[in-house]
Amino acid sequence: MESTLSDLSGVPDTTFAGALKQTITDNLSAHNRIDSTNDTLRKASVGIIVVENDKGAAGFILTRRGKGLRNHSYQYALPGGRIDHGETREETVLREINEEIGITVSKDQILGCLDEYETRSGCSITPVVLWVNDLSSLEAEPGEVEEIFIIDIEELFRADSPKWVSIEESNLKVLQLPIRNRLIHAPTAALLLQFKEVALLGNFMRTDHIEEPVWAWK
């Protein structure tokens, strides 16, 4: 299924070898990010990993969680996991990226962080944005990851995206991001939408108004 892209005028050049890395770095540095104040939530961090696709443009890594996982199995997700005692969010995401998809990433490849997102299932997730050149060791850990996808960044600028859906269970609207022939929901969709608006476009945006689908609340 072909993607329908919106008018890309005003969108930063997504050539991987261009100025995009500096644009993202500058925009994240200027963003006044917020952390959750709810100490009862489990802390986690995930990686929004910017990589080069087969056309020389920038993409990001999306995974499909393993079928055998106890929580949120077979859902689309960003690589990451729960922050262990004594770890920083950055240390967690570097460890989880290596464990889940085989890439060894260093702290100097981190461009910055976005807002923490509180989930209905009791987590507070920090998205960490990274720039990775070497994908030679990219490989799914069979117990945790079913599939790995490299998604063109331009997918975030589709004319049919984002979609907002009203539900009876909440006053907030559920976010859907059409990516390829799939619909990605919050929390992953919330993190990617803020990445688009803040890191790529330099706009102001929070994520606390974004609802998850009811099936993700558990």
Feature-to-residue mapping (PLM):
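NUDIX/MutT-family hydrolases
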Residues: A140-I179, V214
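N-terminal leader/linker segments that precede catalytic domains of diphosphate-processing enzymes
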Residues: M1-A77, G81-E99, I103-S136, L175-K218
